[in-house]
Amino acid sequence: MLKNKGFYRGINLGGWLSQCDYSEDRLNNFITESDFAKIASWGLDHVRIPIDYNILENEDGSFKESGFARIDWALEMCHKYGLNTVLDLHKTAGYSFDSYGESESGFFDSAELQERFYRLWEEIARHYGQYSETIVFELLNEVTDKSYIDAWNRIANECIK
């Protein structure tokens, strides 16, 4: 974790924008302003927000403004309650390890899916790069298969450029 102010004690908001049923009711009501207030009252300094790519992208790879609006709202709440944010892309097109619906695979072998990943991160950076003091980014959750180390290091390096 960063050795900057505000990234020492946090909580994960899993099950809201990731690894969920994606219903509008859940997306709109699973996490509320009172949750952010409670987290701050516990003395925590940041929240980790896992997000699945399909919150931010349509099937064709175009962006969903409604997904970015959810993150915008979460960042407003974090600012209001003095919390920093870890924004975690929990899965991407072609990479998933959860049991919610799709069986995603092929990311590490597909230039097309990797380009889509880069475009998504460019859009995330465009939206949230100005929050550099209060937000950190996890490019992709739990890339643990050792056979993908070289591919992942290449992809991560390209994405960060």
What are the roles of these predicted feature ranges?
Residues L2-K161:
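Active-site mouth of glycoside hydrolases
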